[in-house]
Amino acid sequence: MRLSLFSALLVLGSLVSAGELRLATFEADVTPPLGSPLCFNFIKPAATVETPLTARGLILFSEEKPIVLCVADFVVIANGSHDAWKEALAAAAGTTPDRVAMHVIHNHDSPGYDISASAELEKQGLKDVMSLREAHNQAIADTADAVREALSRSAPVTHMGTGTGIVEKFASNRRIIGENGKLEMARMSSCRNEEIIAQPEGTIDPELNLISFWNGETPLAALTFYASHPQSYYGRGGITPDTVGLARNRRSGETGALHIHFDGAGGNVAAGKYNDGSPEARALLVKRIHAGMKEAWEHQITSELSDSEPGWKTIPTQLPWNSPYSVGELTSQLSNPDSDTKTRIRAARDLVYHRRWKEGGKIDIHCLQLGNARVLFFPGELFVEYQIAAKAMLPDDFVAVAAYGDGGPGYIGTEVSYGQGGYEVGRVSRTAPGVESVLNGVIENLLATE
């Protein structure tokens, strides 16, 4: 018989009262129906399901309230949608939303959800034009059910493992800066221009970081983190978790433990140098990311966690607003029936985030600590420089980074990048150059030792 939430939490309370760390994993199918808009309706809608999409994660139980880590195979979850996911998963796990890290892997052949923007579009008679509200609600409900069902099958965590693999010939920086300090070339997720392909990889983090949890010799779950856009090709109507999702699924089967992958600070990083957008290139990229996952697993170092208490810090943070358009211009774009649908969708997304910022809204940025391992959980499409800086702050410890949490801010560049120009710091970024000083302070505070 299925335990009620109250009964399950009572059982868990008796198990962790002596300081024992326990873990439960969960997974739900969140594949949208055929015909669903994909990538906020900026590409062809869903015509086939190549590989189902999942929301998967784990719950850590200790003497404190549970911690929930979840990542969904969506391109974005933003604003009110991000709040809705955190609230639902927190309620299901018997914890509070500030102890939930909700992320996406940013695969483009998937839905993007932002119920705040959808509400503004609905006022203009544009219901379900950006995403399907019912599919979104169903995905949340099914994932929350999976969390509740996981409560009765938690297992003790006796050991934790940390490992690092090097991913070869996958990532390259999207932004090629000229001698004048301005963007000279853009190298996105795929590229066939030989001159652009020939440019150096640029600033990337080649490390794939892994944290695993064990009950004796039995693996319970694996978390991996790698900084790059995951796209090989997209926009052909085939629903898929793309490169990292396919490699992740394969590793789950090989290890017997649920594999949960987070996209790191890959806002300005993609596979363009090594990807021509062909199916053959996708297969090769999957092979390379899989090799990095496997290497990290095989080279991990395990340590006992019998008396460990997971540390969890949260810093609510307001990021400085930026847009090339005034609020009046955005309002006109949204309300003008002669504007194309994509323009109206962009305007709705910009306006709801501006309103949130103006009202003083903040985004939770988290740090999970287990032994000498720390994981930082960030919003938006964070530039890789933040990840590199975070690791440099604690060079003797294990530091991993997950980005693509709340997608409200869009791209989050460095201070210098906004003056260089380019796609990532144009309309798709809702943050100002001062964001770097804000985030550097947050990182320092989260990584500071007690």
Question: Which ranges hold each PLM region?
Answer:
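Anionic-ligand-binding alpha/beta catalytic cores of soluble enzymes and soluble regulatory domains
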Residues: 289
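Glycan-recognition surfaces in beta-rich domains, encompassing non-catalytic CBMs
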Residues: 293
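Catalytic histidine-centered segment of alpha/beta-hydrolase-like enzymes
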Residues: 269
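Bacterial N-terminal signal peptides that target proteins for export
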Residues: 1-8
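Conserved beta-alpha junction segments in alpha/beta enzyme cores
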Residues: 19-258, 264-266, 274-284, 297, ...
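N-terminal signal peptide c-region/cleavage motif recognized by signal peptidases
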Residues: 13-15
